[in-house]
């Protein structure tokens, strides 16, 4: 739509990529702003040389950005530098993508992550400001810096996946939030292992899950403290020093079982090479697990495709001969695609979606897929603001536990006989841990913009038609 609008305006963009379209769009309104000022000053009988200087001084960056981004949809941080010396950084009106800045008498620096600025500029986190949603940080050639509204603000739906996985865990708030995500899973873990701490080894899948793992261990320790307190009270006045020592020594067994080759990044690998790559990423620490006695509990930050679990992690954990393997995800089920800057747009790649399909097949409800397809096709005929997510009713047929159970089956290789369980974060606990980043469309299907709803319906159409293309 933006591309066609440029054509209608008389522009000739050389390609349809997001970057080129945005550049052409802003460039068009920059030209228009320059022409407006030229006509204004020409009527005042200034010379062309004088007009050039006056345009550079009076160009209204806020106005041109307001006009250029009127029809933008999605999550974005856009930075631009103009030839005469003005610059800007603009954030989407829903605050989907993060942006922070620091300024003093000499410098202005903007980045998507606060710790990068803190490290580079050696400043306290309180000195780094968050760029407000729908605003642009405008840096004039003369050194004046202002935050100006460029697009009406929408409800804040900052991306929660940034907090779970993508952003650096060295940010103070993100670190605490990831710990909280792990801690909130402790009760579900205790239930799964039947509170058998003595025969359970706790570990994590390196390396982004490490902070959530610390939180999980703290949460498990709190549960253990409750057990120890109860035992001490039961002993009463008959307690001996040996009894007390034995009870107080009862602690979670915390080990580093999985070891990762830092040179291999599987999430960002292309589809063709990922399956082969993950087979060689992990190794394990031997000699810690009691064969056929110990349960292994491993924290992961999120489970998107399930490829790493199926092709590597569970295979190699199986060689340790545990009684049971429990994989814990600090994120809820990733059920829906993203179109706001993270390339996760093919539904067939999501293990949660594949679990849903398998459940529908098992229950003889495949006709519902046809219904969803028809609904999606109908949605495409509607104006964007009237579109609705036509996939949510499929997930609503099953509980989170049913889908998790099917996921556990899908990520377990055929030759593995050890029982595998998967525990996921709940949506309410996600929001409890990350209260300021409530954008949860990956998990809930509640997209903050009309463009997101169109993408999820198109993604399902592509899946149903066997079309292996991005949905946007």
Which stretches of residues belong to each language-model region?
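Active-site proximal loops enriched in glycine and acidic residues that flank catalytic Cys/His/Asp
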Residues: 80, 91-92, 112-114, 141, ...
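Terminal amphipathic helices with adjacent charged low-complexity linkers/tails
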Residues: 143-159, 204-238
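A polyampholytic, Gly/Pro-enriched intrinsically disordered region
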Residues: 33-44, 273-279, 345-354
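Extended, hydrophobic alpha-helical segments in both membrane/secreted and soluble proteins
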Residues: 1-2, 202, 209-216, 220, ...
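PRPP-dependent phosphoribosyltransferase catalytic core
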Residues: 55, 68-69, 84-86, 91, ...
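Conserved short alpha-helical segments that host acidic/polar catalytic motifs at enzyme active sites
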Residues: 2-132, 138-201, 205-206
């Amino acid at each position: 739509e933006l591309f066609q609008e440029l054509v209608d305006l008389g522009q000739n963009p050389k390609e349809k990529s997001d970057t080129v379209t945005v550049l052409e769009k802003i460039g068009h309104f920059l030209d228009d702003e320059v022409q407006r000022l030229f006509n204004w000053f020409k009527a005042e009988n200034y010379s062309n040389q004088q007009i050039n200087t006056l345009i550079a001084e009076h160009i209204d960056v806020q106005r041109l950005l307001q006009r250029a981004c009127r029809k933008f949809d999605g999550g974005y941080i856009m930075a631009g530098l103009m030839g005469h010396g003005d610059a800007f950084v603009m954030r989407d009106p829903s605050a989907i993508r993060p942006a922070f800045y620091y300024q003093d008498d000499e410098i202005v620096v903007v980045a998507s992550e606060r710790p990068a600025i803190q490290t580079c500029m050696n400043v306290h986190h309180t000195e780094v400001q968050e760029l407000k949603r729908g605003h642009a940080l405008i840096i004039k050639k003369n050194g004046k810096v202002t935050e100006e509204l460029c697009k009406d603000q929408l409800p804040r739906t900052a991306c929660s996946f940034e907090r779970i996985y993508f952003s650096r865990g060295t940010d103070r708030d993100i670190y605490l939030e990831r710990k909280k995500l792990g801690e909130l899973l402790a009760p579900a873990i205790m239930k799964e292992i039947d509170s058998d701490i003595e025969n359970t080894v706790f570990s994590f899948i390196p390396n982004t899950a490490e902070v959530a793992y610390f939180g999980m261990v703290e949460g498990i320790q709190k549960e253990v403290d409750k057990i120890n307190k109860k035992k001490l009270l039961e002993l009463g006045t008959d307690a001996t020093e040996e009894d007390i020592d034995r009870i107080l020594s009862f602690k979670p067994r915390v080990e580093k079982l999985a070891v990762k080759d830092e040179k291999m990044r599987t999430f960002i690998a292309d589809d063709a090479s990922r399956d082969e790559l993950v087979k060689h990423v992990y190794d394990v620490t031997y000699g810690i697990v009691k064969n056929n006695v110990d349960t292994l509990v491993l924290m992961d930050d999120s489970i998107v495709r399930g490829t790493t679990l199926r092709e590597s992690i569970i295979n190699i954990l199986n060689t340790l001969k545990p009684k049971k393997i429990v994989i814990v995800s600090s994120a809820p089920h990733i059920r829906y695609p993203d179109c706001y800057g993270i390339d996760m747009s093919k539904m067939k790649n999501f293990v949660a979606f594949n679990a849903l399909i398998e459940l529908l097949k098992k229950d003889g409800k495949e006709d519902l897929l046809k219904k969803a397809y028809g609904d999606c096709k109908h949605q495409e005929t509607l104006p964007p603001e009237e579109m609705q997510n036509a996939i949510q009713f499929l997930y609503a047929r099953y509980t989170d536990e049913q889908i998790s159970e099917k996921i556990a089956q899908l990520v377990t290789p055929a030759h593995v006989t050890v029982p595998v369980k998967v525990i996921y974060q709940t949506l309410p606990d996600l929001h409890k841990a990350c209260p300021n980043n409530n954008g949860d469309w990956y998990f809930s299907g509640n997209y903050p913009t009309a463009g997101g709803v169109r993408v999820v319906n198109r993604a399902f159409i592509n899946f149903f038609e066997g079309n292996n293309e991005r949905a946007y």
